[in-house]
Amino acid sequence: MEAIAMAPRPKTKGLPPGTLIKVGKFAWTQMWHLMMARLAPRSQSGAYQRPASQFRQWVGSEAYPAEAHRYSLIVGMGCPWAHRTLVVRSLKGLEDAIAVVRAQPSPDQGMWVFEDEWEGCQTLPELYQVAQPGYTGRATVPVLWDSQTRTIVNNESAEMIVMLNGAFNAIAAHASLDLYPDDLKETIDTWNEQIYHAVNNGVYRCGFAQTQAAYEEACSELFAMLDQLDQVLTHQRYLGGDRLTLADVRLFTTLFRFDIVYYSLFKCNRRRIQDYPALGPYLRDLYQMPGVAATCDLQAVKRDYYGNLFPLNPGGIIPIGPDITLDAPHHRESLAQRSLVEE
């Protein structure tokens, strides 16, 4: 039987491996810089620059009196800035007076969207348009929303937690708890300024840096401040001494996310918080305060960072770990004599 001759298979034509790598690297680098420019504005040196918040009104003014069931907090559970407001709301006992509306980041739309339609809006940018038609700035969380005037009162978390601490005392279950007392304001403000630059925003300056020099500068400042904080907290329970303050709240929401996402995703990997002799127990101490753990959503944090920051994690794979036990004993009770809520 005559054999059938098979035609030789044509060679696959394509770019040589070296050229393919160069082309792919160039295309991805250009796309990365384009996406990072939208995600994280930068200076000429490649350092991340956080845009200022635009809505800066205050509850307690004539236009916005403190009233129960009038205001809502719009938050994202993964966001550390929004988390601050949830912690203070819980510590002050304002759960029945101020509602919480959850939004979540959409990886496809690149914006915050509501879990359910709210105030006639499906996305946060739509709500910003309701508050200020023609608004062209960033639509961020947290938001303090006034249902009576249908507008945004404030979207700056640093100011919102001051309002939540003091403006709503008439309707707060824990009105006696003062997280921003007059005799500690100077100390609190000093800590807030240092912690914001080096830690709260510092982790973002590491993760969103677009040059090696900008990253190394931010990382050095971050860990220098963490080392300083660890030394201070070796001898006192809180940053204000024996009293919990807003400075602790502002630090807590970054520390809670540190080992989970900032250590790996943002390349803040010189040392974990749980490895610090004072900062690790301090984090557990704050987490175990009444009402605080209920504001923490570990899975949302991992989902929102790893699943939505495409330029930093293009594959969108969410890690299983790390295993962190924040319910473990902290042994810091002996460092303070004053109770959290003075009756």
List PLM regions with ranges:
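C-terminal alpha-helical interaction module
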Residues: 1-343
